[in-house]
């Protein structure tokens, strides 16, 4: 396993079906496409590779719509893999994780696993401290998406979710479009249609370590979040419904600082509740894709990740509850 650790972010990538050859051709990140070929619930899994003119490479598997690797140049021009991922489909199947996944139907937590639609209360799986997390234990991150490689930089994944899937109402057809641009941006677009009133909240769940060295903690990374407010959580990581200013708290990243600077401030209740950072920030961008929502930089590699989104919030998770299995 590649042990690249830190923070959930959102980005985009590029593609070429790289596992339909008789001979084994490794990806730039050293992945063997053959190790991603299997059948899950009668559906075929594959590894797809996107590559742009600048030499950036992104590998994606249609199992869970997962980003497996992102290869980008560091300040010296050396290519580095900056996300956490496994080296085979067997590990993704046998070791429960959300690494790089396209989460659905509903990312993050639903309080006590209950939704109310047209006055009717619907009970969903309670798979995390009594709440429904990431669509339940059989969320889309554990299902096989159908794949449509559009060109060498674009991959479209589709998931058809039947009515009653994890007790969510409505037949849903969801699409995730990955586009790798020549300026080393990964554009991810989500869309979904349904025949009933329901709830949908999709995201990408990649973990970044921009140093390119999995033996180094990513807490030395410098983080900026374009947000004056955040939503606090209780001891079960459920949002309380409040919106609170970040000013003069460890939650303030309006001035860039290292993730490590306040991550051990257990005298601050929110750091204690989240065992670090596992919170949503209310973005100042208000859906403006021309404004950066967050920025993360490794002082070692010089690699910078910028996040742009039309959503109202961004979740930052420092992965302090995950214990990496042996490779």
PLM feature spans:
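Conserved small/polar residues in nucleotide/adenosyl-binding loops
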Residues: 322-327
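Sec-dependent N-terminal signal peptides
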Residues: 5-13
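Active-site loop/turn microenvironments that scaffold catalytic and metal-binding pockets
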Residues: 78-140, 222-223, 238-245, 250-253
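C-terminal motif of bacterial Sec signal peptides marking the signal peptidase cleavage site
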Residues: 16-17
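Extended, loop-rich substrate-binding clefts of extracytoplasmic carbohydrate-active enzymes
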Residues: 26-30, 34-44, 51, 121, ...
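Beta-strand-rich N-terminal accessory domains
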Residues: 37-80, 86, 112-122
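Active-site/ligand-binding surface loops and adjacent short beta/alpha elements
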Residues: 214-299
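Acidic, contiguous internal or C-terminal segments within carbohydrate-active enzymes
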Residues: 51-52, 56-62, 160-215
């Amino acid at each position: 396993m590649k042990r690249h650790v830190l923070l959930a972010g959102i980005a985009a990538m590029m593609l070429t079906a790289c596992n339909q050859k008789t001979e084994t051709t490794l990806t730039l990140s050293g992945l063997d496409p053959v190790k991603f070929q299997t059948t899950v619930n009668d559906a075929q899994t594959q590894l797809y590779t996107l590559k742009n003119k600048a030499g950036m490479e992104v590998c994606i598997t249609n199992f869970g719509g997962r980003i497996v690797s992102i290869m980008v140049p560091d300040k010296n021009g050396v290519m580095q893999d900056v996300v956490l991922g496994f080296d085979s489909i067997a590990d993704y199947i046998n070791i429960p994780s959300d690494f790089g996944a396209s989460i659905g139907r509903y990312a993050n937590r639903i309080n006590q696993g209950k939704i109310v639609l047209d006055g009717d209360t619907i009970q969903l799986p309670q798979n995390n401290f009594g709440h429904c997390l990431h669509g339940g234990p059989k969320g889309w991150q554990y299902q096989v998406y159908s794949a449509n490689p559009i060109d060498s930089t674009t991959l479209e994944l589709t998931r058809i979710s039947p009515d009653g899937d994890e007790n969510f109402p409505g037949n849903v057809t969801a699409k995730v479009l990955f586009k790798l641009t020549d300026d080393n941006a990964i554009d991810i677009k989500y869309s979904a249609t349904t025949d009933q009133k329901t709830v949908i909240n999709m995201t990408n769940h990649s973990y970044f370590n921009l140093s390119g060295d999995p033996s180094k903690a990513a807490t030395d990374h410098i983080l900026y979040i374009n947000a004056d407010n955040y939503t606090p959580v209780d001891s079960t990581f459920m949002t309380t419904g409040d919106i609170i200013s970040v000013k003069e708290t460890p939650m303030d990243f309006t001035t860039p600082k290292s993730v490590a600077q306040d991550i051990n401030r257990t005298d601050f209740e929110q750091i204690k509740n989240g065992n670090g950072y596992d919170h949503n920030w209310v973005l100042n961008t208000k859906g403006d894709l021309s404004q950066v929502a967050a920025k993360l930089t490794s002082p070692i590699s010089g690699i910078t990740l910028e996040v742009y989104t039309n959503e109202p919030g961004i979740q930052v998770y420092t992965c302090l509850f995950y214990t990496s299995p042996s490779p």
